[in-house]
Amino acid sequence: MSALLSEDYLNDYISPALACTKPTEIKKEKFVTEDGEFQVGVEPQELEKVTISLSDCLACSGCITSSEEIMLSQQSHSVFLDAWRELGFDKCGSAGDAQCTNKLVVSISPHCRASMARYYGVDVDAADYAILRVFKEVFHATSVIGDGAGRLLSVKRVVEELMERRKASQGTALSSICPGFLIYTEKTKPKLVPMLLNVKSAQQVTGALFKEIALEEGYDVDTSLKDGKRTNVQYHLTIVPCFDKKLEASRPDGEGEVNCVITPREVLAMLGEMGVSFRKYLGDWASLDKQLQQSQLGMLRAEMSPAGWDPLLHWSIPANGDGYSDGYAYQYACTVRDAHVASGCAAQVVSVPGKNADVLEYRVVEPSSEGGKVIARACVLSGFRNIQNLCRKLDPSGHKKRSVRRVAALRSRGRKDSSSEDSTGTPSAISNALGGTANPAECDYVEVSACPSGSINGGGLLMELAPEREEMGETPLPSSTIGGNARRRQQQLQELQAMYKAQIRITDETPTSLPPAALPPLPPQYTMQYTFYIQEEDPAKPDIVTVGNTW
């Protein structure tokens, strides 16, 4: 094998194919008359359409339990529509109708906004405008927001905990914001659970914010309709990029925060079933000048935001360094840098690429030191192969670290490709601090995602472009179009990443520097924390793949 090529460079992306699809069988019975005769050569009658659920794809590999299958079945657009009708939202005249005794609130992640914008061939602002109108006018929602404030609060809390751990020298911390990685760790790597930060993701923090408002206003967040209660209920629907987020919403520690989780694919299917055209709600957006577009969008965002909340903040994200990660690792590095600069010392954040595209490390470097002193390290890591490698190195059960052959070509490539976030500092000192490639196991914090490339590659996103023939209503994509070949999927991902990086608004301040007045009232501390469930590891059980690559 060439010295420049090793198995560490192989990407673990596996495009969905026949090998990972549950075969479908349509059993048709012959229609036999009383005389014992039956006809041949006639067109068969249409039978019930066969569907494949997420549990079909995951349960076969042992990824989820039967109880988790039940949880997944409760998180679908069909379940939402049933609850929507049961709670009487279909009879409301408009958002805020006095006759509506219940309240529907909707949140959406920035990845989904970019995905829907690309799918319909419009910019993100136009997609936001149509999303707001659809959920206001069709579904009669009271509030529709991005999850930006919840994301900022989640990042803020993670950074605060990391700074506390830094003072106590507590070693590597792992994120728990990805349910796929969290479930995998709880079930198969119990010895790594103490390394997990128990700070909830943007989805659940946003849900906690909505829950606090509901309780203050006298609404019930229990939508189980016990005792026939169908009034003064708040229902929270969230739109996310990954299917494993459905399991996150079903965790006992998130009760009442999120009632239903769907993906953009399911939004498309839901609109198709209802005969609603998404394009119709773009209206005359394209004919308006930029100033008028922003004016109309701003008014609509303000109208659909809870009272006292900054609407612009909800539709923004914290700076993330690489352009499309969740920003936890980058914001921690920036906070350490700012604290170091405030103490009178020079410092800057530099990025160091890993051995594949799904690993990126941020190092806080003091360039004035001899040789360049590394003050702090944080890493963004995604994909199951990288997760396995990280777990092997961190697991204290005695796994030997596999020696990695470091050749001069790899070292020079790491230095050459490393990029600096700041322009100051001594080049030689910075170069010395960037020796080699990223090493997540030695970082203070690792932001982990099960999906290769993170949530921007979530399995629920719309990677294709909308067919031009969609005039009267939106047609759900056939399952055969999901994913496509690996090369085409990678091109679609790159286009989506570029749109996300260019069009999703980034807040000017870091989450830790935002004034309290700019953020919604912080929910109680316990509502922002997970409760971890540890399953004892069976040493005789092989380490099977329990995280799907395209959740």
Curated annotation (Swiss-Prot):
<dbReference type="GO" id="GO:0051536">
    <property type="term" value="F:iron-sulfur cluster binding"/>
</dbReference>
<feature type="binding site">
    <location>
        <position position="20"/>
    </location>
    <ligand>
        <name>[4Fe-4S] cluster 1</name>
    </ligand>
</feature>
<keyword id="KW-0408">Iron</keyword>
<feature type="region of interest" description="Disordered">
    <location>
        <begin position="395"/>
        <end position="435"/>
    </location>
</feature>
<keyword id="KW-0004">4Fe-4S</keyword>
<dbReference type="InterPro" id="IPR050340">
    <property type="entry name" value="Cytosolic_Fe-S_CAF"/>
</dbReference>
<feature type="binding site">
    <location>
        <position position="60"/>
    </location>
    <ligand>
        <name>[4Fe-4S] cluster 1</name>
    </ligand>
</feature>
<dbReference type="GO" id="GO:0016226">
    <property type="term" value="P:iron-sulfur cluster assembly"/>
</dbReference>
<dbReference type="Pfam" id="PF02906">
    <property type="entry name" value="Fe_hyd_lg_C"/>
</dbReference>
<feature type="binding site">
    <location>
        <position position="178"/>
    </location>
    <ligand>
        <name>[4Fe-4S] cluster 2</name>
    </ligand>
</feature>
<dbReference type="GO" id="GO:0005829">
    <property type="term" value="C:cytosol"/>
</dbReference>
<feature type="compositionally biased region" description="Polar residues">
    <location>
        <begin position="421"/>
        <end position="431"/>
    </location>
</feature>
<dbReference type="GO" id="GO:0046872">
    <property type="term" value="F:metal ion binding"/>
</dbReference>
<comment type="function">
    <text>Component of the cytosolic Fe/S protein assembly machinery. Required for maturation of extramitochondrial Fe/S proteins. May play a role in the transfer of pre-assembled Fe/S clusters to target apoproteins.</text>
</comment>
<comment type="similarity">
    <text>Belongs to the NARF family.</text>
</comment>
<dbReference type="GO" id="GO:0016020">
    <property type="term" value="C:membrane"/>
</dbReference>
<dbReference type="InterPro" id="IPR004108">
    <property type="entry name" value="Fe_hydrogenase_lsu_C"/>
</dbReference>
<keyword id="KW-0411">Iron-sulfur</keyword>
<feature type="binding site">
    <location>
        <position position="63"/>
    </location>
    <ligand>
        <name>[4Fe-4S] cluster 1</name>
    </ligand>
</feature>
<dbReference type="GO" id="GO:0051539">
    <property type="term" value="F:4 iron, 4 sulfur cluster binding"/>
</dbReference>
<feature type="binding site">
    <location>
        <position position="57"/>
    </location>
    <ligand>
        <name>[4Fe-4S] cluster 1</name>
    </ligand>
</feature>
<protein>
    <recommendedName>
        <fullName>Cytosolic Fe-S cluster assembly factor NAR1</fullName>
    </recommendedName>
</protein>
<feature type="binding site">
    <location>
        <position position="451"/>
    </location>
    <ligand>
        <name>[4Fe-4S] cluster 2</name>
    </ligand>
</feature>
<feature type="binding site">
    <location>
        <position position="242"/>
    </location>
    <ligand>
        <name>[4Fe-4S] cluster 2</name>
    </ligand>
</feature>
<keyword id="KW-0479">Metal-binding</keyword>
<dbReference type="InterPro" id="IPR009016">
    <property type="entry name" value="Fe_hydrogenase"/>
</dbReference>
